[in-house]
């Protein structure tokens, strides 16, 4: 009985290496079968029949590779394509006939053949998809990051339509109509942000008239030292007219322009007086304010809701 127990204890157990050998052998068998299936699938894959260019370039490629052993295959293909285009139809004819014969043989051998193009790799799209913004690149690759970000910005700008002329393209995309007069050559020479200033051309001309009158009156001798105050009043008038709000001003007709010119002559004669006689300064100031106030009431213009020039 003890001898039987000793023999059972002494029986060698299968080692780990022995247990792993069948598994390793099975894995090798599966791998070999997969490799054999891959080779068999490559062998079973039917190639397309050669066209005329392939028939011609078969010998030319070998010859060019022997002459230029360091030349890449893509460069050889480019040169062969350029040489093939330079051949005449008479020179291409035998290769075209050979390609037709090979196609007929291919159709006889594989009547059920159907061309299945291989799927192209999308490496370029993956690179652009997983590219980092400019501020997330490491310091060593700042130049490459700047180039990549610039290319992506140009791409997205082109997709969205926001190129260098973003303002004009935005107007075209949103469908905003333009006035036919906006396409005149005079307006095209001006900047687009200066367009609101064109609406005030009559008022600015009136202000220019007053300013020119102020310059003219500076050279005329005035009594009682009224020259500085007159220049100051006209200068303030020009500044008030220039700082008017952006609302549309009333239309100034030729009648109102003639009235303004008449008032301007009255103001000049008021300073000079009849026969060059001087009047009292307070009377001159009161009449000047009255005439200016009457002019603004007739023109219908109010500056910031207050009567202009009341501070003088």
Curated annotation (Swiss-Prot):
Keyword check for Transcription regulation: yes
Region entry Disordered, spans: 1-23, 229-254
Superkingdom of the organism of origin: Eukaryota
SMART domains: HMG
Entries under PROSITE patterns matching the protein: HMG_BOX_2 (PS50118)
Motif (9aaTAD): 263-274
Record InterPro entries: HMG_box_dom, HMG_box_dom_sf, SOX_fam, SRY-related_HMG-box_TF-like
Molecular-function GO term, any one: RNA polymerase II cis-regulatory region sequence-specific DNA binding
Entry's Gene Ontology cellular component terms: nucleus
Keywords: Developmental protein, DNA-binding, Nucleus, Transcription, Transcription regulation
Domains (record comment): The 9aaTAD motif is a transactivation domain present in a large number of yeast and animal transcription factors.
UniProt-recorded name of the protein: Transcription factor SOX-3
Organism classification: Eukaryota, Metazoa, Chordata, Craniata, Vertebrata
